[in-house]
């Protein structure tokens, strides 16, 4: 039963990362000044 909990936790983390990546892409498209430095790094990360 403990293994099942880890699987669920892993899925939740992956979903959160995907949502975060989507938010990042939207922010980068908007060219928000705060995100400009992070966006430069973000381009090297293959989402």
Curated annotation (Swiss-Prot):
Periplasmic topological domain: 27-47
GO-annotated biological processes: negative regulation of phosphorelay signal transduction system
Annotated transmembrane regions: 6-26
Membrane topology: Single-pass membrane protein
Cytoplasmic side: 1-5
Database matches in InterPro entries: MgrB
Signal sequence extent: none
Main location: membrane
UniProt subcellular location: Cell inner membrane
Pfam families per the UniProt record, alphabetical: MgrB
GO cellular component: plasma membrane
UniProt keyword annotations, A-Z: Cell inner membrane, Cell membrane, Membrane, Repressor, Transcription, Transcription regulation, Transmembrane, Transmembrane helix
Functional summary from the UniProt entry: PhoP-regulated transcription is redox-sensitive, being activated when the periplasm becomes more reducing. MgrB acts between DsbA/DsbB and PhoP/PhoQ in this pathway. Represses PhoP/PhoQ signaling, possibly by binding to the periplasmic domain of PhoQ, altering its activity and that of downstream effector PhoP.
Family: Belongs to the MgrB family.
Quaternary structure, from the entry: May form homooligomers. Probably interacts with the periplasmic domain of PhoQ.
HAMAP family associated with the record: MgrB
Protein's UniProt name: PhoP/PhoQ regulator MgrB
Record organism: Salmonella typhimurium (strain 14028s / SGSC 2262)
Gene behind the chain: yobG
């Amino acid at each position: 039963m403990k293994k099942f909990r880890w699987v669920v936790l892993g899925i939740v983390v992956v979903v959160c990362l995907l949502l975060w990546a989507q938010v990042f892409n939207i922010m980068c498209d908007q060219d928000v000044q705060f995100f400009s430095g992070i966006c430069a790094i973000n381009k090297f990360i293959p989402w």
